[in-house]
Swiss-Prot record:
MF terms in GO: DNA-binding transcription factor activity; transcription cis-regulatory region binding
PANTHER family xrefs: TRANSCRIPTIONAL REGULATOR MRAZ (PTHR34701:SF1)
SUPFAM superfamilies: AbrB/MazE/MraZ-like
Record key words, sorted: Cytoplasm, DNA-binding, Repeat, Transcription, Transcription regulation
Name recorded for this polypeptide: Transcriptional regulator MraZ
SpoVT-AbrB domain boundaries: 5-53, 82-125
InterPro entries: MraZ, MraZ_C, MraZ_dom, MraZ_N, MraZ_sf, SpoVT-AbrB_dom, SpoVT-AbrB_sf
N-terminal signal peptide: none
Length: 148
């Protein structure tokens, strides 16, 4: 579905242009709506879902028993802090300041298409992740059977 890396600039109001290559697909799949939430695994990164995929993720998470602290924290971080965003006539979404400041996204960001969702990274965090990945000689046994 979504793939690729795009350098993004946010304006003073926190608006970013969604790359044109994705707009038609988002319009068809989600009536120009995206759901923004925190990435619970990576600092400096937000997730953007089309509405239908978000509903699947949300529903799967919310049926988990929240008596377990880790489940409750995930529910709070992903569902409780989510924001419904709508593309405007210029193909822009407005990223809430609370989300931008929490992950240190300023004027420059990176949008990654990750199949069923997007990752929106602060430019600095994405650069650090790439440097760490490139310098990490051991990517783990999980990649041994992957044909690249």
């Amino acid at each position: 579905m979504f793939q690729g890396e795009t350098a993004i600039t946010l304006d003073d109001k926190g608006r970013m242009v969604v790359p044109a290559v994705y707009r038609d697909l988002i319009a068809r799949m989600s009536a120009n709506r995206l759901v923004l939430t925190y990435n619970p695994f990576e600092a400096g990164c937000l997730w953007l879902y089309v509405e239908k995929e978000w509903e699947r993720v949300r529903d799967e998470l919310m049926v988990k028993p929240n008596a377990h602290r880790v489940v409750r924290v995930l529910q709070q971080k992903l569902v409780g802090s989510s924001a419904l965003l709508e593309l405007d006539a210029n193909g822009r979404i407005s990223v809430p300041s609370s989300h931008r400041s929490a992950v240190a996204i300023g004027k420059k960001a990176v949008l990654l298409g990750m199949g069923d969702k997007f990752e929106l990274w602060s430019e600095q965090a994405h650069h650090a992740l790439i440097q760490q990945t490139l310098s990490d000689g051991d990517l783990g046994d999980g990649l041994l059977d992957l044909r690249l």
